[in-house]
Every structure is written in structure tokens, then in C-alpha cells.
Amino acid sequence: MEYTYQYSWIIPFISLPIPILIGVGLLLFPTATKNLRRLWSFPSILLLSIVMIFAVYLSIDQINTSYIYQYVWSWTINNDFSLELGYFIDPLTCIMAILITTVGIMVLIYSDNYMSHDQGYLRFFAYMSLFNTSMLGLVTSSNLIQIYIFWELVGMCSYLLIGFWFTRPTAANACQKAFVTNRVGDFGLLLGILGLYWTTGSFEFRDLFQIFNNLIDNNEVNFLFLTLCAVLLFAGAVAKSAQFPLHVWLPDAMEGPTPISALIHAATMVAAGIFLVARLLPLFIAIPYIMNLIALIGIITVLFGATLALAQKDIKRSLAYSTMSQLGYMMLALGMGSYQAALFHLITHAYSKALLFLGSGSIIHSMESVVGYSPDKSQNMVLMGGLTKHVPITKNAFLLGTLSLCGVPPLACFWSKDEILNDSWLYSPIFAIIACSTAGLTAFYMFRIYLLTFDGHLNLYCKNYSGKTNNSLYSISLWGKEGSKIIKKNFPFFSLLTMNNKERSSFWMKKTTYPFNSNVTKKMRPFVSSPHFSTKNTFYYPYESENTMLFPMFVLSLFTLFVGVIGSPFTQFNQEAIDLNILDKWLTPSINLLHESSKDSENWYEFVKNATFSVTIAFFGIFIASFFYKPTYSSLQNLNFRNSFVKSFTKNFFFEKIINIIYNWSYNRGYIDTFYRISLIGGIRILAELTYFFDRRIIDGITNAVGILNFFVAESIKYVGGGRISSYILLYLVYLVIFILVIYFVFF
């Protein structure tokens, strides 16, 4: 087995030939490479599958033996400094490697069809393979220098993929925003690494932790300086994992292709920050203030992300804020010292969120057949609805991911989120109340997404009926330019919806006002098939995606169903003590500051109590979302109750004002972007204008003033002479005599 560990260094580099070969092929044989572009997906998937098999093999050995392996090559630069490069294989490395490869394979299979008509197909697969290579290099790194190198490569790949359609201004701006925001965190990370090396003299994790603890125990170092270094290290994770207040890049990152959104949110970019904190947790534990800061940032992000997701119209942005909130749960767990719960939620959330993003990609793909390539419309949930009958397989997969993220048993996220909620009660009741309340908000906004997308009828052709703004429908190319294909929308659907047969014949002859009929379902079919409508408009409807897009969703659905078993509290299956808690054995020895000496009976009691409470909150959130967003005509039996509630609710202006405040808060992203735009961007522009004024008016003014002064002096002097040489000689002699006399009387 040790022979296998010796060759583990190859794990990050197995997928590296793909971007190299694509680049060489486009450089030397561009025509042939482009003609055979669909063949490049197979080696990409094959090589990543080899990495997955390798990682699974190592993980099985980790579970059975808890063996930790580190190999280091030392490069001595001089007598005082040597650079060590190597790889580190432990349970955290294996967990992340399996997560990256399994999600990455599903995304690559999905992307083969999703990106098949895109001009940048080859570029996309080159970026994706480089992305997987960078992330695998990050998780196998044995020291902080390697971490930082691969950290920057992960960031670079994410910027390239966020701005993949770089000719679209929104995509280019999103790429710049992600770059600038992460520069803040990455600069802090670099300073923290240098500060730790200056203090401990080592970059290696094992040596670093031991030296760090010895310095603190013996009071041989400035504790304030160590705290500052730890804060700077944590700043890198805050930016990369979209934690408050450096979260602003994450929603805009949805401008990239949907498959890369799934990979970024599940297993790569945002997971890198959680991995860094988990890797450095022994260091952070030695500084209690940092642990409290991590927990505080986590709980703020949990609540902040959930509230911002409440009123989003874009399906991908809604899921992005959901990711932000769930990452906050992981950071909260790490801050509480619940290492296993954080990694467990990282695993379950990765598969659930990958399923949701691939499902949203299937929805967007189907909507593009109706509205064309227009992200403002194909991703707008207001224009969706009624997709259940058009994309039933996608609907079932999306529902499974939604229920999992809501925390409904026995799906994956229920087990991990409930463990975090249980630990939060032991850490701080205030944090626990916020975390549990946010669990209800999560159920609310996730079912809001589901109901707006799949329930009711397609709102695209019902905009007059549903009160939506009547926007012109146009298509734009894959490169962001408006096309000339216009879908005419002159058909007054609301009026036609409520006509009887006699009124239809005179529809074009006179203008009539018609009463509203709430039973829309009966009126929908004639609108599509009745021969009485003499209109030139052709209405298209979404359709289910192809099998190559549905297969990854099916596999991720299986993960969402069963992956929660590896960390469930069912430690014994029967009298023979079959242990199902694989994660507990996998992460041995595990860090848990809240359960150092707890018994199974106490754990069971806490689990049942908190599980009942959290599931109740989740179902309450689902009920509220169903009450407000489930179409009236699909639940007519509750119509009288709902009408009476709405009437009594609208009379209370206080509640109406609160709802408006919450909506504005969510729709305007918590005003954080506005604050940054005014304070940072506006402040920098004011500083630039002041600098420009100082440079042009003061610096250039002084220089120009000297030149102008010389000009006027020269103009004045030129009129002193009369143009006669004898006068000049006489004047020169007079000045010379005066000069000699002055020198004589002064020095002699």
C-alpha cells in the first residue's frame, strides 16, 4: 500500500495533459482540432475518472488504517533557506479529492451536450481540466507555499470561466469584480503566510503546528502578532468562500456557463476557503479569538445569504445566495470546533447544490428554445412556471435537491445541517436561534424557487394576465450581441382568456372590457388549439434535455439520496454492531471541541430533539412558501381562506411596510454593493480626481510658471539693449569692474 502512496504525487497532474494538448492542437493543427472538438470530452472524463479511482482506493485505506502519508523534496537554496515541495495524504485530502473528481466528472459529461453549440467548446474543456488540476494540487499540498501557488491557479481558472463569454459586458464586469474582491483576500493570505514563516521558520503543516503551539505555550512570541497573522490567513478564506463582507463577487459569477457554476459552488472555488480553514484548524484552535471570529463571520453569512435570496428573480443568483448561506453553516461549524460536521455538510451540500445547478442549467436550456439566448429571460423565474409537464425528469431531480437543501429527512443535507444545529446549541444559544431561523428561511426561498419555476402555467405567454411587465423578447448571440430575431407580442392574452365564443368573432372590431375569470385552467387549452384565433404568432414551449444532460443529474440524485448515510448517527445497525458512521472512522482522529466526552445515549437524545425541531421549522418554511407562491388556480379549495387572509393582511400597513423593506433589502443585495460603490469606488474616483487636479494645477502649474516667468524676463531684457555691440562691451566692462570691487572690499 505504501507503494501506492509514493505515487500519489501524480494525482493533480493526471488531467493536466488535456489543456496542454488542446493548446498545442489549436496552435499547430487548428482546423483538425476544431473539427474533432467533440472528441476531447472523452479523454477529459477518462483522466478525471482515473483520479477518482485512485482517490477512492486511498480513501478505503484511510478508513481502515487511519494512515497519514507525507513526502517532501527539499531544495536547498543556501545555508539559511531551503524550499520544500511535496504532497500530503490524509482523510481531508481524500475527502476533497473524491468530491472534486465525482462532481467534476458529472459536470464534464453534462457540459459535452450543454456547450456543444458554443464556439468556445475546446476552450471550455481546457479551462475545466486546468481547474480540476489546480484544485487537486491545492488539496494535496504539504505546505503553505504550495497552497498559495495552487490557490492562485484556482482563482485564475475561476476568473477565466466566469468571464468565459468575455464579449458580454456583464460577464467581463463579473470577472473583474471576482478578481478585485479576491485580490483583497489573497493579499491577506500572502501576508499571513509570510508572517507565520517569520515567526516559526517553516511552511510545512506538521512542523508549523508543533512550533506554533510551543511558541504559545512558552510565551516566546507576541500573541497580538500571531492573532494578526491568523486573521490575515482567514481573510483569504473569507474572500474565496464568499463570506461576509467579501461575498459580493459570487452572485455576479453566475454570468459564466451554468456547468461551471455547478463546479464552482460544489467542489472547487468556494470549497477552497473551507478547505483552508479546515487544514489550518489546529493553528486557529490555539487562538480562541480567531475561533470566535470564524464563528461570528459564519453566522452573519448564514443569515445574510438567506435574506438576500428571498426576492431574487434570477434562478442562478438565487442558488448563488443559497450557496453563500450554506458555506456560512460550514464556517460556523469550523468556528465552533465541529470539524466533522463542517466537512460532512461540505460533502452533502456539494452533491445537492451540483444537482440544483445542473437542474437549473437544464431549465435554462429548455427556456432558450422559447426566448432565445437571452439570460435576462431564460433565467428569469417570473417568466417560468408550469414546467412540470414540459421537463418532468428535471423537475423531479430539482425537487430532490430542493428538499435536501431544506433539510427534509432522509436526504443528504438533513443529516449534516442537523448536526451543525445541534452543536450550535452547545456553543451559543443566540447563534443557535439564528441558525435554526435561517433553516426556515432556507426552506422558504428554496421552495419559492421550485414553485415559481415548475408550478402553475408558463408565465411567458401570460404576462398581461399575471401582471408582469411586457418586455420585448429578443435573442442575443452567444457572444452577447442583440440579434434581429424579434418575437412579436401584440396578442392581448388577458382579454382572449376571458372571452366567450360570441365575443371572439368581434374581438378585432371593437374594444371591450371583460371581467376576470379565476378558473384559468379551463381557458388555457383553447388558447393553444382553437381555430378561432386568426393570429400569426407561433408559441413555442420548453422541452426536456437530452440524456447526456439527464444522466449526471440522475447520478447526483443518487448521491443526494444516500450520501448522508456516511455520517448518520446510526452507529449500529444490528446486534453484530455494523458501524454505518463511515465519516467518523474516516476522520479519526477528529477535532470536535463540543463532543469530547459525550455518550451515545446523550447524542441520540440531542439528535432526536433537534431533528424534530429543525424539520418542523423546515416544513413551516415550505408551508409559507406554498401559501404565497403556489398559484391560486392550482388550489382552488383554499381560495376563500387565502382571500380572507390577504384582505386582512393588506389592511395592516405595518406588515405591508415590513414586507416591502424585506423585499427591497433582498432585491438590492442588502445595499452592500451600493455601499462599496459609494465608499470604495466613489472614494477612489474622488481621490483620482484630486490627484489629477494636484498634478495638472499644482505640479504642472509650478513648471509652467517657471517657463512663463523666464519668458517675461527675457522679453523685458531684450528691450534694454539698443542693438550696438560697443554698448554691450561697455556694459560688460562696467559689471566686471563692479564685481572686482565687491570682491576686493569683501575679501581683502
Swiss-Prot record:
Enzymatic reactions: a plastoquinone + NADH + (n+1) H(+)(in) = a plastoquinol + NAD(+) + n H(+)(out); a plastoquinone + NADPH + (n+1) H(+)(in) = a plastoquinol + NADP(+) + n H(+)(out)
Transmembrane segments: 9-29, 40-60, 89-109, 125-145, 147-167, 185-205, 219-239, 258-278, 280-300, 327-347, 354-374, 396-416, 425-445, 550-570, 611-631, 728-748
Any one cellular-component term (Gene Ontology): chloroplast thylakoid membrane
Enzyme class: translocase
GO molecular function, one term: NADH dehydrogenase (ubiquinone) activity
UniProt-annotated location(s): Plastid, Chloroplast thylakoid membrane
Protein name as catalogued: NAD(P)H-quinone oxidoreductase subunit 5, chloroplastic
Organism: Cucumis sativus
